C-alpha cells in the first residue's frame, strides 16, 4: 500500500472515531457499508456517475444477481469525508451524503446542487409469505423537488408525459409496459431493481416504489447531466442497443392474419405492382393451425403445406375456419417456397411466435416434462394453452431448438415474439404463486419479456453471425435493448384520443433508454369503424397516423378485421 493510500485510510479512521453516529460505517473499495434502522446498507459507486444503494433487513447482509444490470463496478476514485452526522462520498461527477442514523441519503451534482433524496426512515420491509417462502413487501420513498418533471415508467396509456402526481400499478400487460424507472429533467435517473408487481406513487409528500415481494431494497442512481448523458448511463449499466440491419427500419405490412402463403405473397405482389415501397411482410398466428395446437412452431395448418383434404392435417385447421372454403389451386405450396418468394421480391419476412403452447404440441409435452409450464389461463382461453417458463435456461434452449429447426432454417428473417407479458386471463391472486425457475411468478413477473427475448437473441447469435437478430415484441423491461428487441404499443384502438396517448407512451418508453418502439398505424382494433372502412373520419385518422409512423423506428401497418 503506498503512502497516499495509507494517509487516506488513516484520515477515514479518524473521521469515524470522531463521529459517534458513523462508528458502524465501514469503508469498501468503492463505497461504504453500515447499519441503519434495522437494515444493512451498502452504497457503492459503479462508475463516477452511477451509484448503487442496496438495503437488506435484519443483521444478515445478502447480495443478489440482477437480471437487468450487467455492468460490474468499475475502478472509481472516491473521496470520503464527514459533514456533521453525515458521511460523504464523492466522485468526479457526483457527491453522496449519508446519514447512518436516519438512513437518509442525498445525491448532489459536483456543484453541490441537490438532485435527489432517499427519504429519512423511507425504507419499509413488511413480512410477506411468498408462496411459502418468507420474504417482504418492499417500499422505498424519495423526495423530489416540488416542480421537478420526471419521465419514464415504461409505456403507459395515461396520456401523461410528466409522470408526477399519480399512482400507477406497474404490472406488464397488453398495451402497458411497466418499468420502475424515472428520468428527471434535472439530468439523473433512478432505477428500482425489482421485478414483482410494483405500485408507483407520487404526491406532495414523497415519491415511492412499493413492490409486492423482494428480499432487498435495491436501486441505481444514474447521473448524466442531460437526457443524452442519462441514456448513455442506462446503457452502460444495462447493455447497449445493437444497430439493426437497414431493412428493418422501413415499412412493414401486417394484418391479423394472412390465411395462406398465396394471400401473403399476393400482398407483396400488389405493393410491387403499385410501386409503393415495402421492406417487409409479417405472418401472424395460426400458420400452426387450431388453438389446441397453439404455437407448435411448425407449419401444420393444411393451407400452408398443401394438405387440404388430408385427414392427418385437417384436424389442425384453425377453429371456425370453413374446411370447404375454396381458395383455388395454390400457387405457393410450402412455407419454404413462401419465404423464398418474398426474398425474390426483394422484401423480408417476419413470423409470429408466442410465449405459450397448446396441449397438442410437442413443445407443450417437452416443457411439461421439464416442469417449465406456468399453469394459469392465457390466450386463447379454454384451449388448455399454457405459458412457458423463460426464466429456465433449459426451457429457453428447447424454445430456440424448435424455432431453428422448423422456421429459422427455412430462411426466416425476423421474429415477432407476441404476448410476452404474458397474456393472463381470468386473473387470480394464487396464479402468482405459480413456481418458476427463479421462484414465484409474483417475484419475477415483469422480467418475463426480458428473459424470453434473451433466450431467442442469445441462441440466434450463437447459431450464426451471418444474420443480425431482429425481435419485435409486445412487452419489455429495462435492459431488453441489449437483445435487439423492438416493442410496440399493443392492441390499441382506432381513435384520435388513443393515437394521442401513444405519443406520450412512446416518449416515456424511449426516455427509459430503450430506443426501438412503434405503434400499430391506424390502430389495431377498428371498433366503431368496423364494417365502415369508407368513413372519411377513419381515412383521416389513418393518414395522420401514417404520417407520424414515418418518424417511428419501424413503420408498421397492423390491423384486425
Name every feature range the model reports, one short phrase each:
Residues 25, 29, 44-87, 125-128:
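A low-complexity, Ser/Thr/Gly/Pro-enriched, surface-exposed linker/loop concept
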Residues 1-24:
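Bacterial Sec-dependent N-terminal signal peptides
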Residues 280-561:
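Aromatic- and carboxylate-enriched substrate-binding clefts and catalytic-loop regions
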Residues 82-248, 254-257, 261-263, 268-273:
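Catalytic and substrate-binding clefts that recognize carbohydrates or anionic sugar/phosphate headgroups
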Residues 45, 55, 91, 98-100, ...:
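Glycine-rich, histidine-containing beta strand-loop boundary motifs that form or position
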Amino acid at each position: 500500500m503506498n503512502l497516499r493510500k495509507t494517509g487516506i485510510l488513516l484520515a477515514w479512521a479518524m473521521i469515524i472515531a470522531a463521529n459517534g453516529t458513523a462508528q458502524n460505517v465501514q469503508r469498501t473499495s468503492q463505497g461504504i457499508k453500515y447499519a441503519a434502522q434495522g437494515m444493512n446498507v451498502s452504497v457503492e459507486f459503479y462508475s463516477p456517475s452511477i451509484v448503487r444503494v442496496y438495503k437488506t433487513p435484519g443483521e444478515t447482509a445478502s447480495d443478489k444477481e440482477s437480471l437487468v444490470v450487467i455492468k460490474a463496478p468499475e475502478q472509481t476514485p472516491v473521496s470520503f469525508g464527514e459533514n456533521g452526522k453525515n458521511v460523504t462520498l464523492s466522485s468526479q461527477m457526483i457527491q453522496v451524503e449519508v446519514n447512518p442514523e436516519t438512513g437518509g441519503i442525498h445525491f448532489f451534482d459536483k456543484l453541490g446542487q441537490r438532485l435527489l433524496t432517499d427519504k429519512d426512515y423511507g425504507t419499509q420491509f413488511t413480512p410477506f409469505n411468498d408462496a411459502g417462502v418468507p420474504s417482504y413487501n418492499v417500499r422505498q420513498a424519495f423526495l423530489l423537488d416540488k416542480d421537478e418533471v420526471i419521465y419514464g415508467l415504461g409505456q403507459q396509456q395515461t396520456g401523461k408525459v410528466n409522470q408526477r402526481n399519480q399512482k400507477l400499478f406497474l404490472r406488464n400487460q397488453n398495451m402497458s409496459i411497466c418499468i420502475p424507472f424515472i428520468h428527471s429533467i434535472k439530468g439523473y435517473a433512478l432505477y428500482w431493481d425489482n421485478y414483482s408487481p410494483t405500485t408507483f406513487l407520487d404526491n406532495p409528500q414523497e415519491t415511492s416504489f412499493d413492490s409486492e415481494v423482494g428480499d432487498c431494497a435495491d436501486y441505481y442512481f444514474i447521473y448524466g447531466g442531460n437526457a443524452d448523458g442519462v441514456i448513455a448511463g442506462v446503457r452502460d449499466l444495462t447493455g447497449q442497443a445493437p444497430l439493426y440491419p437497414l431493412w428493418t427500419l422501413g415499412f412493414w405490412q401486417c394484418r391479423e392474419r394472412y390465411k395462406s402463403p398465396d394471400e401473403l405473397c399476393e400482398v407483396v405482389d400488389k405493393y410491387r405492382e403499385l410501386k409503393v415501397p415495402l421492406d417487409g411482410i409479417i405472418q401472424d398466428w395460426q400458420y400452426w393451425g387450431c388453438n389446441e395446437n397453439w404455437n407448435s412452431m411448425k407449419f401444420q395448418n393444411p393451407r400452408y403445406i398443401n394438405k387440404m383434404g388430408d385427414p392427418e392435417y385437417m384436424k389442425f385447421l384453425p377453429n371456425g375456419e370453413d374446411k370447404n372454403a375454396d381458395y383455388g389451386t395454390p400457387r405457393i405450396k410450402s412455407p419454404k417456397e413462401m419465404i423464398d418468394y418474398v426474398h425474390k421480391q426483394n422484401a423480408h419476412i417476419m413470423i409470429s411466435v408466442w410465449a405459450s403452447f397448446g396441449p397438442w404440441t410437442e413443445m407443450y409435452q417437452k416443457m411439461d416434462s421439464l416442469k417449465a409450464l406456468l399453469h394459469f389461463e392465457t390466450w386463447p382461453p379454454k384451449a388448455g394453452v399454457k405459458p412457458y417458463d423463460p426464466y429456465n435456461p433449459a426451457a429457453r434452449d428447447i424454445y430456440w431448438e424448435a424455432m431453428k429447426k422448423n422456421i429459422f432454417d427455412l430462411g426466416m428473417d425476423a421474429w415477432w415474439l407476441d404476448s410476452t407479458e404474458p397474456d393472463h386471463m381470468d386473473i387470480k391472486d394464487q396464479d402468482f404463486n405459480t413456481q418458476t425457475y427463479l421462484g414465484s411468478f409474483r417475484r419475477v413477473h415483469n422480467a418475463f419479456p426480458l428473459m424470453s427475448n434473451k433466450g431467442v437473441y442469445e441462441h440466434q447469435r450463437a447459431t450464426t453471425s451471418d444474420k443480425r437478430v431482429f425481435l419485435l415484441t409486445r412487452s419489455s423491461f429495462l435492459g431488453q435493448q441489449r437483445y435487439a428487441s423492438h416493442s410496440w404499443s399493443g392492441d390499441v384502438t382506432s381513435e384520435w384520443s388513443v393515437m394521442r396517448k401513444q405519443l406520450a407512451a412512446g416518449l416515456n418508453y424511449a426516455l427509459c433508454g430503450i430506443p426501438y418502439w412503434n405503434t400499430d398505424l391506424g390502430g389495431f382494433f377498428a371498433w366503431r369503424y368496423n364494417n365502415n372502412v369508407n368513413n372519411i373520419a377513419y381515412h383521416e385518422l389513418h393518414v395522420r397516423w401514417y404520417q407520424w409512423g414515418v418518424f417511428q423506428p419501424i413503420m408498421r401497418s397492423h390491423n384486425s378485421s
